[in-house]
Amino acid sequence: MAKKQNILSPIIRITFTFLVLCGLVYPLIVTGIAQAVMKDNADGSLIYNDKNEVIGSTLIGQNFTDPRYFHGRVSSIEYKAEASGSNNYAPSNPDLEKRVEKSIEEWKKQNPSVPVTEVPIDLVTNSGSGLDPDISPKAASVQVERISKLTNIPKETLDQLIKDQTEGAALGLFGETRVNVLKLNLELQKIMK
């Protein structure tokens, strides 16, 4: 019996030590560093309105259906963050073709003047998470004509707005040039007022 206690005692001490280190100390240190170095990102990159109410996050896309606004990527989960993910069909899967064709048809209804061959792929396909907040600058640009027509905002103003909201690759290396749809639409809303 004494031999069993000799074996169990270090196991219990090691388990408790790692529980405290990994479950308490490490998370507190990482949270403290994140709050000190990049507070906005650590808090979820939230965007507030004039009344200091949260209206979204730069990290999670929103579904814009009003034709006067820029639209983001297609989301099979309807931008519900708790259901992150999408049906990542293989290129050979007929369901992918059906989904893309449906997205193209919806696109054509709202943007009849833009040839289908000019529709950027990111406007008719899902991202891996289904929550992508960004589109390519080209995906924003092909929507300018529709928005200009519906809002009477000159195309040049909308083009400049896209240019101002375009972000480069992180550290010049990671990712693509992109436009955050929520931030772009908030700037558009300021012009419309």
From Swiss-Prot:
Top-rank taxon: Bacteria
Which keywords does this Swiss-Prot/TrEMBL entry list? ATP-binding, Cell membrane, Ion transport, Membrane, Nucleotide-binding, Potassium, Potassium transport, Transmembrane, Transmembrane helix, Transport
- Return the GO cellular component terms, semicolon-separated: plasma membrane
Write down the membrane topology: Single-pass membrane protein
Q: Work out whether the entry's keyword set contains Magnesium.
A: no
| Residue pairs linked by disulfide bridges in the UniProt entry | none
Subcellular localization, as worded in the UniProt entry: Cell membrane
Is Nucleotide-binding one of the keywords UniProt gives this record? yes
Using the record, list the residue span of the signal peptide; answer none if the entry has no such feature. none
Bilayer-spanning residue ranges: 14-34
Q: Which GO terms describe its molecular function?
A: ATP binding; P-type potassium transmembrane transporter activity
What the entry lists under InterPro entries is as follows: KdpC
User: What is known about its subunit structure?
Assistant: The system is composed of three essential subunits: KdpA, KdpB and KdpC.
Its function, per the record, reads:
Part of the high-affinity ATP-driven potassium transport (or Kdp) system, which catalyzes the hydrolysis of ATP coupled with the electrogenic transport of potassium into the cytoplasm. This subunit acts as a catalytic chaperone that increases the ATP-binding affinity of the ATP-hydrolyzing subunit KdpB by the formation of a transient KdpB/KdpC/ATP ternary complex.
> Belongs to which family?
Belongs to the KdpC family.
- Under what name is this protein listed? Potassium-transporting ATPase KdpC subunit
Q: Which organism is it from?
A: Bacillus thuringiensis subsp. konkukian (strain 97-27)
